[in-house]
Every structure is written in C-alpha cells, then in structure tokens.
C-alpha cells in the first residue's frame, strides 16, 4: 500500500523562503497550499516564478493558494480545516526590523499572535496529534548578544519590536509543545538571502544598486551601519533545514546558520567586485564614503536615517546541532550567494522586471 501523499500549508508563501520551500516540497511529492493576502491578487513575480517552475515539473495541480491573514483567527481555522495539512510552515511575518519600530503593534499582532492563532487553529480542528508545525524564528532574538557564537542555549536579548514579537512566538511554540504534546518546533534561522529577497532589505538593496551601475545608472547608494556583522546564508539551503526539522522522531528547536560572519561593508565590496569595481573607503562615521579605486567616483555614502534605534552589531550562529542531528549542510558559500544575487539583479534590470 502506497504512503499517503503529504500536504503542506505555508504562510508567507510569497516571500523568498515560501517560494523556495514550495518548489522544494513539490519536488518531494507534496501537495502545497499557500496563504496569500488580498494585495497579492495580481500574483507578484515570486508567485509567477513558482507557477513557472511547477509548469516545468508538470505539477501545477500540486499548488493551491488561499486568501488569508495571520491576524484573522476564524479565517485561519477555516483554512486549516479545509486543507487538512500534515505539515504547517509559518513563514508569514512583518519581517523588516526597522519597520517594526514604526509599526510595533502590527508587528506584534502578526509575528507574535499570528503564531498563537495558527497553533489554536490546529487544536480547535482536533489536529494536534496529526499536524507537524514549523515556526520561523530568527537570530534577531539574540540581539545584544550574550555569547559568541549563538546556539540553541544562548540567552535571548531582543533589540527590536520584531525580535520581541518573535520571542513571544518562540515561547508559545515551546509552551504548546510541552502542554499539548504537539509536534511544534522553532527554526532559529540566521540571515539568509537570495535574488528573491525583498528590495528593502540591505543585501538586496546593495545588489540591485550594483546591478544598476553595471547597466549604466549613475546613482549613490545610501546605507546605515556598514560595520554591522551578520551570518549570511542562501534561503534555498535554509528551506531544506525547515523540512528536515519536521521529519524527525521528536520536535526540537534548531539554530540554522553558516558559522561565518561578514560585515555589510564586505557585502558592498564583494558586490561591486562582481562588476569589476574595487571599492575603497575614506572618512569616519556618518562622513565615511566608498569610492572606486580606479576612478575616484563615489558610490556609497552613509545616511543616519538608516540607523536602527537599537543596533544589533554582531550575529554569528553555531549550527553544530543541525549538522549532527539533521545531517544538514550549507551548499552555497557567501561569495557564491553575492555572485548569484548581483547576476540575477542585472538580469532583472535588463528584462525590465518592475516587481523585482
């Protein structure tokens, strides 16, 4: 007798993680259901890309999209009941750290209480013994870091409304796992990027700018704290770790990271190097600027408006537990990530793709 086909429900399917996870799960033979907000009725480029790839796999019938929102409990209950999933991946969030200072209540509602609403939907549908639940947690929980590198046992010290909301979600997952014996786990993912990263995030902001320079634009790139250091990986690698977490005998929380740290400054330099421009620096603090070593032309300046009210200076993850128990490995290096992002952004500009 053949094994019953698995059914996954993904919130945040229009984001970079959601799109890569969708493609990954369908390649594994899953039926995938995704929750999208009404504003995405036109199907943005990421959703289009999912459908294109699925068409190539001749598996378009494996993806169904539903209108919904993490702030609407009755809607979530209805979707969970209708879809009857075996796995739920909660990737939906207001995930921009700086925006969370301006929209703190909304961020808490979506990122914190949204997780609770999904867990309660699972329980109210009587599926707590059937559904495996993945919660997208974040390295921003560590904030003002208490130790280097950060592992599953490192104390949290959140430094933004986004991180505080995610800390609530983290602990409500732990609480429901222990109180109701649910298969629910947190993936504490360190920064992960891709050509599908939103254009307001610093990595994508950099690669889009560099691509523009390569295509003949004449502009200045304004950044905030270029000395901030992050552990950057590729989203395509990280979604496999999400899936692996739900394939274990018992639910556990895992740090997913590369174990390497790089500064925003280094990301800028590597991005420009992809178009044969060597960036040098002069000046200090907000007066610092990056210029082309060969021509002296200034390309990068500092703008204080991009500083966070409370900065997170260094994030460096320890992925040893995931490597040992999940047999998970990084496949894309930092250099390969930057190269892919710049190349794809050049392609986007040349193709006139306004949604990217």
Curated annotation (Swiss-Prot):
Gene name?
A: gmd
Pathway assigned in UniProt: Nucleotide-sugar biosynthesis; GDP-L-fucose biosynthesis via de novo pathway; GDP-L-fucose from GDP-alpha-D-mannose: step 1/2
Q: Where is the active site?
A: 138, 140, 162
The cofactor required is: NADP(+)
Recorded GO molecular functions are: GDP-mannose 4,6-dehydratase activity
What Enzyme Commission number(s) does the record list for this chain? 4.2.1.47
Q: What is this protein called?
A: GDP-mannose 4,6 dehydratase
Q: What functional role does this protein have? A: Participates in the synthesis of GDP-L-fucose, catalyzing the conversion of GDP-D-mannose to GDP-4-dehydro-6-deoxy-D-mannose (GDP-4-dehydro-alpha-D-rhamnose) which is further catalyzed by GDP-L-fucose synthase (ger). GDP-L-fucose is important for the synthesis of fucosylated N-glycans which are expressed on the cell surface.
Residues bound to NADP(+): 12-17, 69-70, 91-95, 106, 166, 192, 197
Q: Which SUPFAM superfamilies match?
A: NAD(P)-binding Rossmann-fold domains (SSF51735)
Effect in UniProt of substituting residue 108 to D: In strain: HL250; loss of activity
Similarity annotation:
Belongs to the NAD(P)-dependent epimerase/dehydratase family. GDP-mannose 4,6-dehydratase subfamily.
What Pfam family does this protein match (any one)? GDP_Man_Dehyd
Q: Is NADP one of the keywords?
A: yes
Source organism of the structure: Dictyostelium discoideum (Social amoeba)
Q: Provide the reaction this enzyme catalyses.
A: GDP-alpha-D-mannose = GDP-4-dehydro-alpha-D-rhamnose + H2O
User: Which Gene3D superfamilies does the record cross-reference, listed alphabetically?
Assistant: NAD(P)-binding Rossmann-like Domain, UDP-galactose 4-epimerase, domain 1
InterPro entries linked? GDP_Man_deHydtase (IPR006368), NAD(P)-bd_dom (IPR016040), NAD(P)-bd_dom_sf (IPR036291)
Keywords from UniProt, A to Z, are: Lyase, NADP
The UniProt entry, under NCBIfam families, shows:
gmd
Q: HAMAP family this protein is in?
A: GDP_Man_dehydratase
């Amino acid at each position: 007798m053949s094994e019953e086909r698995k059914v996954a429900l993904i919130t945040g399917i229009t984001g970079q993680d959601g799109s890569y996870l969708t493609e990954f799960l369908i390649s594994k033979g899953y039926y995938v259901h995704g929750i999208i907000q009404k504003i995405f009725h036109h199907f943005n480029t990421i959703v289009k890309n999912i459908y294109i790839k699925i068409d190539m796999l001749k598996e378009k019938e494996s993806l169904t999209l539903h209108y919904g929102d993490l702030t609407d409990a009755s809607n979530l209950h209805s979707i969970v009941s209708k879809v009857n999933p075996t796995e739920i991946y909660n990737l939906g969030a207001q995930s921009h750290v700086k925006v969370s200072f301006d929209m703190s209540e909304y961020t808490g509602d979506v990122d914190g209480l949204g997780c609770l609403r999904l867990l309660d939907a699972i329980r109210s549908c009587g599926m707590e013994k059937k559904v495996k639940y993945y919660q997208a947690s974040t390295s921003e929980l560590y904030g003002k870091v208490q130790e280097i590198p950060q592992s599953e046992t490192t104390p949290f010290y959140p430094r933004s409304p986004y991180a505080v909301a995610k800390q609530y979600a983290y602990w409500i997952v732990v609480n429901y796992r222990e109180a109701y014996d649910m298969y629910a786990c947190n993936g504490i993912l360190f920064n992960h990027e891709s050509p599908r990263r939103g254009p307001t995030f610093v990595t994508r902001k950099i690669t889009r700018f560099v691509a523009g320079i390569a295509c003949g634009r004449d502009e200045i790139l304004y950044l905030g704290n270029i000395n901030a250091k992050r552990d950057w990986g590729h989203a395509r690698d990280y979604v496999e770790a999400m899936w692996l977490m739900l394939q274990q005998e018992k639910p556990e929380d895992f740090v997913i990271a590369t174990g390497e740290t790089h500064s925003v400054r280094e990301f800028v330099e590597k991005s420009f190097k992809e178009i044969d421009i060597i960036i040098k620096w002069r000046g200090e603090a907000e007066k610092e600027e990056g210029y082309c070593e060969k021509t002296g032309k200034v390309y990068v300046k500092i703008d204080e408006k991009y500083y966070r009210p409370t900065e997170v200076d260094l994030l460096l993850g320890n992925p040893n537990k995931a490597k040992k128990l999940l047999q998970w490995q990084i496949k894309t290096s930092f250099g390969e990530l930057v190269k892919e992002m710049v190349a794809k952004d050049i392609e986007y500009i040349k193709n006139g793709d306004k949604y990217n």
